[in-house]
């Protein structure tokens, strides 16, 4: 599958400034920046579901976008950044004075979270995803969003002129059987975002295709990310679609579909002047250095 360069710019677009801090050798200790709610944050803080031990010796600084984390590094507020590999590549391209340590620290897969009582929806969705993988339309969908342009906060500001927005019908609890109600957090382009009063993104297009396949009216409910998974099965919400990483704890609330994106992994961004990771060959090499901070 073609990797998502668009996601990347969604989280980047930062003005670069040369960075003077080369390592964590300061009285304040080591600080690493992450995007809030991402696997990178879980990796640093620790997460039993994903078998992450975390780093009690490192201060995790969370930012609303990866671009802001890199800006903080360039400004000397933090030492490194941990973020998705494709995001990292674009951030480094946008910001002179930075480089990627291209060794995977973690891996994740994205899937949709379906109401446990609706196996028919899960079956139809898995069938749809299999068809899209087989005929190349899933790859084409990812490629379609490569041209997105973003501001510093990750908001789409261009590149989607040829993308048709998706309307959400009004929710009708008296017609639950005739509607597919999707929970999302429409602030994660290219997977989901608002285009005026409409929705757009990879996840949203897959949900529209699923609704059409099932002969249902599509309803999209935009909410805080933390509520997306837990909302499923309540108030007639059928499915969660929000760039969801498959996690054991989430399986308590939903049944996951087959994965539709499995190329994400976390890497380290450091200042160009930093050489302490240059000889690293494996994840263990990097982790040994981080644990010694």
Task: State what each model feature region is.
Residues 27-64, 85-86, 186-189, 199-212, ...:
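Bilobed "Venus flytrap"/periplasmic-binding protein-like clamshell domains
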Residues 43-48, 53-61, 100, 130-176, ...:
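Ligand-binding clefts/hinges and TM-proximal coupling segments of bilobed small-molecule sensing domains
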Residues 2-12, 16-31, 139-208, 213-217:
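N-terminal hydrophobic or amphipathic helices and topogenic motifs
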Residues 34-37, 95-106, 116, 208, ...:
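Acidic, polar ligand-binding/catalytic clefts
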Residues 89-129, 148-167, 186, 261-270:
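Periplasmic-binding protein-like
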Residues 38, 111-152, 204-213, 270-287:
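Extended ligand-binding regions for polar small-molecule ligands
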Residues 1-31, 36, 44, 84, ...:
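Gram-positive cell-envelope targeting signals
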Residues 47, 58-65, 70-71, 80, ...:
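Extracytoplasmic small-molecule ligand-binding "clamshell" domains
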């Amino acid at each position: 599958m073609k990797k998502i360069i668009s996601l990347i710019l969604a989280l980047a677009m930062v003005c670069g400034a040369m960075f003077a801090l080369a390592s964590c050798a300061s009285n304040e200790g080591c600080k690493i920046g992450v995007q809030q709610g991402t696997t990178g944050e879980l990796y640093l803080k620790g997460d039993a579901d994903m078998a992450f031990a975390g780093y009690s010796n490192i201060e995790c600084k969370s930012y609303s976008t990866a671009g802001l984390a890199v800006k903080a590094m360039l400004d000397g507020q933090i030492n490194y950044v941990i973020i998705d590999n494709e995001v990292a590549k674009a951030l480094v391209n946008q910001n002179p004075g930075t480089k990627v340590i291209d060794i995977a620290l973690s891996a994740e897969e994205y899937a949709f979270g379906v109401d446990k009582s609706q196996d028919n929806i899960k079956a139809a969705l898995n069938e749809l995803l299999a068809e899209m993988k087989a005929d190349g339309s899933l790859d084409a969908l990812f490629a379609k969003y490569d041209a997105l342009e973003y501001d510093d906060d990750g908001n789409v500001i261009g590149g989607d002129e040829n993308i048709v927005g998706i309307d959400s019908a009004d929710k009708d609890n008296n017609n639950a059987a005739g509607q597919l109600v999707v929970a999302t957090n429409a602030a994660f382009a290219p997977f989901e975002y608002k285009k005026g009063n409409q929705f757009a993104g990879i996840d949203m297009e897959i949900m529209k295709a699923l609704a059409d396949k099932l002969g249902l009216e599509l309803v999209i409910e935009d909410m805080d990310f933390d509520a997306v998974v837990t909302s499923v099965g309540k108030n007639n919400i059928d499915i969660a679609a929000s760039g969801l990483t498959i996690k054991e704890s989430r399986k308590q609330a939903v049944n996951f579909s087959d994965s539709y994106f499995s190329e994400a992994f976390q890497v380290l961004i450091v200042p160009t002047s930093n050489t302490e990771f240059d000889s690293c060959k494996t994840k263990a090499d990097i982790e040994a250095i981080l644990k010694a901070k």
